[in-house]
Amino acid sequence: VTTKLKDLPLNGMLLCAIATLLAGCQATGGSNDSMMPGGGQAGTTPRGTSAELAQRAQQTPTGDRLETARLRTELAFNYFQRGQMAVALEEIKAALAADPVYGTAFNVLGLINMDLGENAKADEAFRKALTILPNDSDALNNYGWFLCQTKRERESIDRFMQALKNPLYASPDKPYLNAGICSQRLGNEPAAEDFFRKAVSLDPLNASANLRLGDIYFRRNDFERARAHVDRVNKNYDPSAESLWLALRIERKAGDRVAESSFAAQLRRRYANSEEFLLLQQGKFE
């Protein structure tokens, strides 16, 4: 049995919890801002709770259509993060009613439709966002992740590379991480390793990129490098079932039974109901 790292982020770590995994709101210049990547996180968090944003939206002067659109979009994203998709869609409709060319609203609409499995609608929304914001790195990253999720990996990598052309992009590690994941899906391990290494060089604590590098080196029997990347995750974040399982398998393969037993005990204590603990009980280490 071959266990694979999950494409979306890890319990209590970073990323789209998942793809898990999502972001916030970041000004990009001009009249639009942009919201977060599908495969990672970027920007700041929305500027208040749902109740605060709703109150501010109601108090916004009727003529200030851009501010209304911005607040409604942030409110929609709050609901999206909480899994309240019907309410999120209503808020996005209100945002676009206020400003039909507010690119960030189309970006968030794409994320919502992607989560709902409405792929045609998601594709249309992302394309509209990029028609309005053709060089927006977050929108490019989000659309790239959508393309990867819908088995258009080569096209997705092109979008991630476009996202990286902006020298002011605040989260360049995220497109590199996503490009690595999509390269693995294409079976291109050397490219994936290179992308993950670039992600880690930009953000040494990027949990998903570190675990993926750890997994690559584990499968090559390069235990020292594998251990270094997994240890970085387990020492800086609350360990997940996935990170403990990888650490356990590294030590087992390296022949360190004491360390293996320690990780097994942690996995049992923390994640007794996890898929990883079931694999441990079944003795399926590869």
Regions found by a protein language model. Name each.
Residues T62, A69, G103-T104, S137-D138, ...:
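Helix-start (N-cap) detector for alpha-helical repeat units in TPR-like alpha-solenoids
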Residues E74, V108-L111, N142, Y176-N178, ...:
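Canonical tetratricopeptide repeat
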Residues N32-G38, R47-T60, K235-E286:
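Terminal, low-structured helical/coil segments at or just beyond the last alpha-helical repeat
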Residues D64, A98, I132-L133, N166-L168, ...:
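Structural marker of alpha-solenoid helical repeat scaffolds
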Residues Q26-K93, A97, Q281:
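N-terminal leader/linker segments that initiate helical-solenoid repeat arrays
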